[in-house]
């Protein structure tokens, strides 16, 4: 076998499927809040010869030889992560956000300990104590939600739950909460009940890095995140701490506690993404992400579609479809038929099951990467509203699909052939 063959020659089936996915991304409006488009540089790092290197352990403390260059790469990723988030300690090895959270649990908790996180149906995450996840099986998980009137965090209610349940760990940071998080108020509650405080900023990491969202580092014992989403890096995880000595306990929980060898090609891609996020133009990008979300939210509200909490402070726009007598499952299908990619999502106090839902979650990070601006997002909002408010109108469906293609052609994704990035 010639290992120098390119993908098209060695496996045309996979090559064709990748090209089909590339075409889908280019010709659809990507509004899934947890997705973004990585740069060519990030993808080049992921597809590099670093894929071949095994490197158990930490830089300068490996169990294998030949790690001198991956040590430099990982050390650079660590330093850039610390600089980006004003942290004194970082571990860049977690394979995902879920793995980062698992490592924190292994360090701070024992089976049966009580953890307090947001209810999944209110915008929490599976790894914050859902009964279908190990976090809900190994620990006594209790939950808080949002206020029924405002759909925002109610710290008096959260405090009452914490005082009643005395959790060992309180988790803040969410997957479908569109408002700013008051980490200082969480810190006061954690101190009052003697709990550790963890922030999972997977969705808002890019906004935190650019100081457009409050930074949890000064208030939380530990912070976890993914490196894609608003940070626009490779799919992976990261753990951060303000206290360097406290942070060291998580090193052993990552390896050998929950993982084996790190993925050095992904760590290199993380380093590239952190470097990109440290540049001034990433601040401008993040500002536009938030502005686009506000424009999208206001456009939909004007068309009579309710938005959870009445708006957004980040990249997430969560539609409450009860306002138009529609389920999330139906809405997801309707927008997908005109080449808009989103996901059905529960809303607070949702009467529907998680398989049906009353909400549709949208995010602006990916399309902002393509260059979508205020005017473009007005059009995105109008297309979505036209489709949802006229579900049985075939002419509207046809016109919406044409308008989507016009936007995609106006804002091309990758203007050069992706194969060029790996030659």
From Swiss-Prot:
One of its GO terms (cellular component) is cytosol. Pathway: One-carbon metabolism; tetrahydrofolate interconversion; Amino-acid biosynthesis; glycine biosynthesis; glycine from L-serine: step 1/1. Its cofactor is pyridoxal 5'-phosphate. Its EC number is 2.1.2.1. The modification N6-(pyridoxal phosphate)lysine is found at residue 229. InterPro entries: PyrdxlP-dep_Trfase, PyrdxlP-dep_Trfase_major, PyrdxlP-dep_Trfase_small, Ser_HO-MeTrfase, Ser_HO-MeTrfase-like, Ser_HO-MeTrfase_PLP_BS, SHMT-like_dom. The record marks 228 as: Plays an important role in substrate specificity. Homodimer. This is Serine hydroxymethyltransferase. The lineage of its organism: Bacteria, Bacillati, Cyanobacteriota, Cyanophyceae, Synechococcales.
């Amino acid at each position: 076998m010639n290992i120098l063959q390119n993908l098209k020659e060695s496996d045309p089936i996979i090559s064709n499927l990748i090209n089909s996915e590339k075409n889908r991304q280019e010709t659809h409006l990507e509004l899934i809040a947890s997705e973004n488009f990585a740069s060519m540089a990030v993808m080049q790092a992921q597809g590099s010869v670093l894929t071949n290197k095994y490197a158990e352990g930490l830089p300068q403390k490996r169990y294998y030889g030949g790690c001198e260059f991956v040590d430099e790469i990982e050390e650079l990723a660590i330093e850039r992560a610390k600089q980006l988030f004003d942290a004194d300690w970082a571990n860049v090895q977690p394979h995902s956000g879920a793995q980062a959270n698992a490592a924190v649990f292994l360090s701070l908790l024992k089976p049966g300990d009580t953890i307090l996180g947001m209810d999944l149906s209110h915008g929490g995450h599976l790894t914050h104590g859902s009964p279908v996840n190990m976090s809900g099986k190994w620990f006594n998980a209790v939950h808080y939600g949002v206020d029924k009137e405002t759909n925002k965090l109610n710290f008096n209610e959260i405090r009452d739950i914490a005082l009643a349940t005395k959790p060992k760990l309180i988790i803040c940071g969410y997957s479908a909460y569109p408002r700013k998080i008051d980490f200082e108020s969480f810190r006061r509650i954690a101190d009052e009940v003697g709990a550790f405080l963890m922030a999972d900023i997977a969705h808002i990491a890019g906004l935190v890095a650019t100081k457009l969202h409050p930074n949890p580092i000064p208030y939380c014992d530990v912070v976890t995140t993914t490196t894609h989403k608003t940070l626009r890096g490779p799919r992976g995880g990261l753990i951060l701490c303000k206290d360097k000595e406290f942070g060291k306990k998580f090193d052993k929980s990552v390896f050998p506690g929950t993982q084996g060898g790190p993925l050095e090609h992904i760590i290199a891609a993380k380093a590239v993404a952190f470097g990109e996020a440290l540049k001034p133009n990433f601040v401008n990008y993040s500002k536009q992400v938030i502005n686009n979300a506000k424009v999208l939210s206001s456009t939909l509200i004007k068309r009579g579609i309710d938005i959870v909490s009445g708006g957004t402070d980040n990249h997430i726009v969560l539609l409450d479809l009860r306002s138009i007598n529609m389920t999330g499952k139906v809405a997801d299908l309707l927008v997908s038929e005109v080449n808009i990619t989103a996901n059905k999502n529960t809303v607070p106090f949702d009467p529907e099951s998680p398989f049906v839902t009353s909400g549709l979650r949208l995010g602006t990070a990916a399309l902002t990467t393509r260059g979508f601006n205020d005017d473009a997002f007005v059009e995105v909002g109008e297309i979505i509203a036209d489709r949802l408010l006229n579900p049985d109108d075939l002419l509207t469906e046809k016109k919406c699909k044409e308008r989507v293609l016009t936007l995609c052609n106006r804002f091309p994704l990758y203007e050069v052939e992706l194969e060029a990035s790996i030659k």
